[in-house]
From Swiss-Prot:
The gene is psaJ. Belongs to the PsaJ family. This is Photosystem I reaction center subunit IX. One of its GO terms (cellular component) is plasma membrane-derived thylakoid membrane. May help in the organization of the PsaE and PsaF subunits. One of its GO terms (biological process) is photosynthesis. Pfam families: PSI_PsaJ. Gene3D superfamilies: Single helix bin (1.20.5.510). NCBIfam families: PRK02733.1. It comes from Trichodesmium erythraeum (strain IMS101). The keyword Thylakoid applies.
Length: 41
């Protein structure tokens, strides 16, 4: 269990999890409000 926590707290694993969470939030936000993310220039 200690080794698993040490592995999960390494930077590449944390970065991957953070990117997946961020992408999920953006996808869900874009599903409900499709026009708010892309403003016309």
């Amino acid at each position: 269990m200690q080794d698993l926590l040490k592995y999960l707290s390494t930077a590449p694993v944390l970065a991957t999890v953070w990117m997946i969470i961020t992408a999920g939030i953006l996808i869900e936000f874009n599903r409900f409000f499709p026009d708010l993310l892309f403003h016309p220039m």
